[in-house]
Regions:
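Active-site rim beta-loop-alpha module in soluble metabolic enzymes
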Residues: 14-17, 46
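Short beta-strand/loop motif that positions the catalytic acidic residue
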Residues: 43-44, 50-52, 56
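Catalytic active-site module of serine/aspartate enzymes centered on a nucleophile-bearing elbow/loop
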Residues: 76, 81-110
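Short alpha-helix in the alpha/beta-hydrolase fold that links the catalytic acid
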Residues: 46, 60-69
Length: 110
């Protein structure tokens, strides 16, 4: 077991429920799945909305660059500059809601 990862939130008034420990087998499974998934990123042709926090302490922000570069559809990026990993509970939560609703409305217009 490894120490758990949780509450990577800039807003001190917010907390996230998280496991105290992370089983190593879960991380190995995730790594294996991500390696396989990466082989198919070039098949993504639909519009993408990628949001990431430059100060994320859990997932490197560069991971979104991998997807943005590999995907063949249009990519819209939003930087969540005031938040950490759990951005939906953090300072940028209203921005996330606004951008997701706007994106969904635009891409579903027929």
């Amino acid at each position: 077991m490894l120490p758990g990862v949780g509450s990577d939130i800039a807003d001190p008034d917010q907390t996230e429920m998280a496991y105290v420990q992370t089983p190593v087998v879960c991380l190995l499974s995730l790594d294996s799945a991500l390696r396989e998934l990466t082989l198919y990123l070039h098949d993504v042709t639909m519009p993408l909305l990628l949001m990431n926090a430059p100060q994320d302490h859990v997932v490197p922000p560069s991971n979104s660059e991998i997807l943005a570069t590999a995907a063949r559809g249009p990519v819209e990026r939003v930087s969540l500059d005031r938040s950490y990993h759990v951005a939906t509970l953090d300072y940028d939560r209203s921005l996330i809601e606004e951008k997701v609703v706007d994106f969904a409305e635009r891409v579903t217009k027929g």
